[in-house]
A protein has these predicted regions:
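C-terminal substrate-recognition "lid" of short-chain dehydrogenase/reductases
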Residues: 215-246, 251
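Substrate-binding pocket helix/loop in short-chain dehydrogenase/reductase
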Residues: 91-92, 96-104, 209
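Conserved NAD(P)H cofactor-binding loop of Rossmann-fold oxidoreductase domains
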Residues: 84-88
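Active-site helix of classical SDR
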Residues: 115, 152, 160
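Short, small/polar-rich loop/turn modules that mediate ligand/substrate recognition or access, typified
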Residues: 168, 173, 239-241
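Residue(s) in the substrate-gating loop at a strand-loop-helix junction
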Residues: 135
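Alpha-helical segment proximal to the catalytic Tyr-Lys
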Residues: 120, 165-166, 237
């Protein structure tokens, strides 16, 4: 059976851990030529990829320069996966101006930067798939203490639909993936933060996370990566502008 992403050139941001790394690994296993980036390039060590590079997606100059480098060396991307993100915990009362600005810059504007930088070359060949990581906590569902995070992830869905509409007749598709609670280093840090804030043990906090899941378990990054591989592939050629849940029934 042929590999579904054979020879496709794919860029994955925040590929050093969690969902981003799982996507980069799955893409490589499906035959893609993966360009893996992360702000901490040490996290990219051991990752099978065509190119590994430190990239600050909050810097327009860095993203533009990197896009020019890739276009010159390798040509237009076939797939762009935007994974970089940050989870702020708290309500509107806990959200400072800095928290708001940082969250929107990393969770939303970073996607604007990469899409704006890489889409022109995709347009040149009238083909490309963009996959943006949003969340079930967004315009789909409100969750306590995810005020600015939910707002940013709702914005990601809106951004994705806008890009899909703009380029729907030019060969470029854009879709959003909306994970529920996924086992990852990011979740581990949130559990630690919650434990410190509440005085509860790590086991108690983790148990509470699991008990909130309709399926009675947390999701796995590989389950998100499987959907990303499908959306990036030609098998999904008639799918664009959608928010796809991988949430174990969280949004039911």
């Amino acid at each position: 059976m042929p590999l579904r992403l054979q020879n496709k050139l794919a860029l994955v941001t925040a590929a050093g851990q969690g969902i981003g790394r799982a996507i980069a690994e799955m893409f490589a296993s499906e035959g893609a030529r993966v360009i893996a980036t992360d702000l901490d390039d040490k996290k990219l060590e051991g990752l099978k990829s065509l190119k590994r590079r430190k990239l600050d997606v909050r810097s327009t100059a860095s993203v533009d320069s990197f896009a020019h480098e890739i276009a010159t060396e390798l040509g237009a991307l076939d797939v762009l996966v935007n994974c970089a993100g940050y989870v702020h915990q708290g309500s509107v009362l806990d959200c400072s101006e800095h928290d708001w600005d940082f969250s929107f810059d990393l969770n939303v504007k970073s996607m604007h930067r990469t899409i704006k930088a890489f889409v022109p070359d995709m347009l040149g060949k009238q083909a490309g798939s963009i996959v943006n990581i949003s969340s079930a906590v967004s315009s789909i569902r409100g969750v306590p203490d995810r005020y600015v995070y939910g707002a940013t992830k709702a914005a990601v869905i809106g951004l994705t639909k806008a890009v899909a509409a703009d380029f729907i007749k030019k060969g470029i598709r854009a879709n959003a993936i909306c994970p529920g609670t996924i086992e990852s280093p990011s979740l581990e840090e949130r559990i630690k933060d919650r434990s410190r804030a509440t005085g509860k043990s790590l086991a108690e906090v983790e148990k509470a996370f699991v008990e909130r899941q309709p399926m009675g378990r947390l999701g796995h990054a590989e389950e998100v990566a499987a959907l990303a591989a499908f959306l990036a592939s030609d098998e999904a050629s008639y799918i664009t502008g959608q928010a796809h849940l991988v949430d174990g029934g969280m949004a039911l």
